[in-house]
Amino acid sequence: MDKTALLQHYFGYGEFRPGQEELVDGILAGRDVFGIMPTGGGKSICYQLPGLMLPGVTLVVSPLISLMHDQVMALKAAGIPGAYVNSSLTFPQLRAVYRNMLLGKYKIIYVAPERLQSDGFLEAVEQMNISMVAVDEAHCISQWGQDFRPSYLKIVDFIRLLPRRPVIAAFTATATQKVREDVKRILDLRSPVEVVTGFDRPNLWFEVRHPELKDGELLRLLEARKRRSGIVYCATRKSVEQVCQLLTDRGYAATRYHAGLEERERMENQNAFLYDEKTVMVATNAFGMGIDKSNVNFVIHYNMPKSLEAYYQEAGRAGRDGSNADCILLYAPRDVQTARFFIENGSDNEDLTEEQREVIKKQDYERLEAMVTYCKTRTCLRGWILEYFGQKHPEVCGNCGSCAKEYEKKDITKEAQMILSCVRRIRDHLGYYVGKPTVVRTLQGSREKKTIELGLNEISTYGLMKTMSANAIKELISRLEDGGYLVTELEHQTLRLTEKASGVLYLGESVEVLVLKQEEKLQRLDDDGMTEDERELFDLLRECRSRLARANGVAPFMIFSNATLMDMTRKHPTNMTAFKRVSGVGEMKASWYGKDFLRVLKGAAK
């Protein structure tokens, strides 16, 4: 079969998504390739499909045990022989996999980078024809990447040990230009076919909220999404426990996941979410990156992550099946303190040198600064993300929380002059910059001991804004940060003037900010456009999928995604020929599951 026939036969798609065919053709022509595609953009097909067509075996290097398991289960569900090699396997299981590798029973083998240098794996590989090495999450090989893993450097040594250099295929969803160049250099990609399909996920709605009480806001969001499946990310284990308890007390089918739980409980909770027994997963970032669940309708961040790379990767768990999905971040200033704590205490990897730790810490603070700016910006959120990753974009996307709000301009030149002048005079008086609280206290004319001891009551801007509340002054400072007049140096939490501030202080330039004409609570829900009858049929098909999933020991989305069930609902096939035309079905799955689904479809047609 040719590539298009294989795409239909095994994966159920009649055509390639953007970028896929170019990468597949490159691999089949013996070229190295580098695919930069968003989460849910179909990266796995780019190496799985040519892996079926190449004469030898494809090795896929992946950093995540749970992702390997899910990917191999999905391969088997599609009728493709695959296996994985990682630390989750017992010695007898590992020995059985090695034996089957030598017998040529697998076309695609997932392997953890740590296993590439193990004697048993190397002995098996020496006797195999390796046609391709695919590197998933390729940004992990670069120290400039947000998930740098020294174990990924072993990939290069492993490839050199092979008797013949295979095709090298690298893939990532989140990488700046600097990281991309580093990946190509380290992996020694030779004149690669490089495809950047863009980082945009048009089906995702982005929104940042600044609630006074996060619990109440979270409950309101979930109340509007009762029928939907989603993830609530928290920054700490303690927050996970508290939020999960809150949701279960309110009757939500919620479960939890964090590194503090026993592995058995983590797996039970993960499977309950994957099998749709629980609809809400409350988790730290230990969950999600390796989960291939396609029918996640929303991702809510209860706390701000420490980088846009992390945020976009976690938010990208939503809408993988192409359906509309919501990505909502609940921001509070204390989230910055939590992120700083993780940065200061996060570089405990024993494989890193002290110099590497310092480089990573500096980069982490730069990323945190970008993340905070995203949370505060009033410009297009999608545009902000795309610009960060170096992609051009329209000024307004029309599909995010910022674009849905109506703003008007307000002149705050007088207030800006007071604040900027105060920051400058404190620096001149003390010889160094101070934090935001000290600036606010000075402007309010505080008589606190520290203010007096520093002599800040003697500068001309002391008490200049004494009629304003501390919160009002803080909000103005935030607006000046948004406008680029001030910047918070996050490592030491000092408020500093930028070059742009000089125009206001010395040249009489005015300052205008955008304010909401009317504060409104946005509530974007996924409008699937289904009629009442279609919704009823869709639910029956979901029940059929759940029954088959339990019977076959696989997650429901591995049988068919929500997008496939939706297409099935709308096309309403009543015979096998029509059933195979449903997007995402394919020959193999039609032969295994077709009769069961057609029974439901025919029953609904009566």
What are these regions (language model features)?
Residues 359-389:
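Short, charged low-complexity linear segments at domain edges
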Residues 15, 163, 291, 377, ...:
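Helix-turn-helix/winged-helix DNA-binding modules
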Residues 27, 222, 273, 375, ...:
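Short helix-to-turn junction characteristic of helix-turn-helix DNA-binding domains
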Residues 46-47, 59-60:
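Hydrophobic alpha-helical transmembrane segments of integral membrane proteins
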Residues 1-10, 14-18, 22-44, 51-54, ...:
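Helicase motor core with emphasis on the C-terminal RecA-like subdomain
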Residues 1-3, 337-338, 349-353, 363-365, ...:
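Accessory DNA-binding and partner-docking regions appended to nucleic-acid-acting proteins
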